[in-house]
Amino acid sequence: MTQILLPIALLCLFAASTLSNPLLVELPNGELRGRDNGFYYSYESIPYAEPPIDDLCLEEPRPYTERWENTFDATRPPVDCLQWSQLISQPNKLTGSEDCLTVSIYKPKNLTRISFPVVAHIFGGGWSFGAAIDDGVRPFSSSGNVIVVKTTTEWERLGFMSTGDSVIPGNFGLKDQRLAIKWIRNNIARFGGDPHNIILLGFSTGGSSVHLQLMHKEYGQLVKGAISISGTATVPWAVQANARDLAFRYGKLLGCNNPKNSRELKDCLKKTDAEEFVSTLRHLQVFDYVPFGPFGPVVESPEVESPFLTELPLDTIRSGNFAQVPWLASYTPENGIYNAALLLAKDANGKERIEELNTRWNELAPYFLAYPYTLKRSEMNAHSQKLKYQYLGYKNFSVVNYFDVQRLFTNELYKKGIELSLDSHRKHGASPVYAYVYDNPADKSLAQFLAKRSDISLGTGMGDDYYLLMNNPLREPLRADEKIVSWKLVKMVEDFAAHETLVYDDCVFPNNLGKKKFQLVVIGRNYCKQLEVESFARHGVQ
């Protein structure tokens, strides 16, 4: 009985302290001051790990333990981690800081609640760019029923470079996330959050990150549910092969010539200027911003002392040795828009760049489709030609045939991998597994930004649903129907966090566990419906 009452007593104690002056919060590090934003409070840029600089560069993340002598200013928005960002239009795409490992907490003003369920947010960005500050919390804060915590983690070389051994084991970005989630669990009660009622939510590589976190069985004790939007642990870009070769190649670009071993490479890389280190990413890109994330998660060497991944996620799922919590995965009918849209951009002569694929397909396809290091060159060419014939037949690459390319990218980069994840969970898991497809094209979208044109209707693409949950200037202003859908999606997530039930409007999500056919909820402009299919990758769910 005492074991039950103690957490409740602590929760009430923290709730009382936040009610007396909700802007001041006491942490083990000292006192911090947040901001009153009218209908919600924010506590931003709170460090959870030591900055990965100097001796800590390319090392395992360490918890932040510094004591504050004065009240910590938690009114400053989070900063980007140092990155070469696709979302910057200028030639110099460098932005951010190495001192970036923070959490930012957004608490509604809802006096009817003593404590709130918690949505822990992991942002996306191709393992190479993106930031917590890009995605707003207005939809959740306006609704007022959950606390949102945004985490900031390392991307690019600092987050995912690996030498394939214990010297630079890799997965630092995922280990940052793991540390942030534990920080949230240990401290969220001080802000009025329920530490026993946390769900993870991520988009794109953030969605894959959420799923990868579930590969640790003990996470069932840290979180009670998870949502992966447009990304899982089994999409082809989720785990990288041959990371060691890429690390040494990158070192050579930075002037680390002919290191004898991983230790020599690491010593050289640590001496490299951080901005030069990150900016060098552009030399790995073979077409615009392709590959989108040359560095990514890896299966770590058995000699690593505290590994994040020791086997492929698919093997972990099939073993059943993963966190058994309710999990929701989603996609859009044209998810591949994100990867394909830049082909619609025009070059300096006004010619669509998609036509370059007619002479460069064998060269570029492996980088677009995430297999540049997994096959031999002869095998890659054969595979690339097979895919071209499967989706385009003998047609040339052109704007007229653009949607065949978009369908290729959608199926090969998203639908097949997401289906594989859901199929493995329903066969080998013990907890509920849910899925939805969102079909309501945006007038203003990420795809249009990348294509630099609005004269072509591209369909429902990556982010069209996500940015109704986490607002972004790229998607604004919303249409009237999108505002209604946004409210319903937010309520869906809130109910999932509070009650572990999944309902969108009047559509109850069916559980896929043990089912022979996939059970989906289709969310459209002004409707929702349940759908049963054998394969949504082949079925072409619209």
Curated annotation (Swiss-Prot):
Q: Which cysteines are disulphide-bonded?
A: C81-C100, C256-C268, C507-C528
Signal sequence coordinates: 1-22
Catalytic positions are: S204
Q: Which residues form a coiled coil?
A: none
- General function of this protein: Transferred from the ejaculatory bulbs of males to the female genitals upon copulation, plays an important role in the reproductive biology.
Task: List the keywords (alphabetical).
Answer: Disulfide bond, Glycoprotein, Hydrolase, Secreted, Serine esterase, Signal
What catalytic activity does the UniProt entry give for this protein?
Answer: a carboxylic ester + H2O = an alcohol + a carboxylate + H(+)
What tissues has this protein been observed in? Specifically expressed in the ejaculatory bulbs of male.
Single Gene Ontology MF annotation: carboxylesterase activity
What name has this protein been given in UniProt?
Esterase S
The EC number on file is 3.1.1.1
Source organism (scientific name): Drosophila virilis (Fruit fly)
Which terms in the GO cellular component ontology are assigned? extracellular region
InterPro entries the record matches:
AB_hydrolase_fold, CarbesteraseB, Carboxylesterase_B_AS, Carboxylesterase_B_CS
PROSITE patterns per UniProt: CARBOXYLESTERASE_B_1, CARBOXYLESTERASE_B_2
Asked if the record carries the keyword Disulfide bond, the reply is yes
Q: How does it assemble?
A: Monomer.
Q: Which residues are glycosylated?
A: N110, N396
Q: Does the keyword Methyltransferase apply?
A: no
- Protein family membership: Belongs to the type-B carboxylesterase/lipase family.
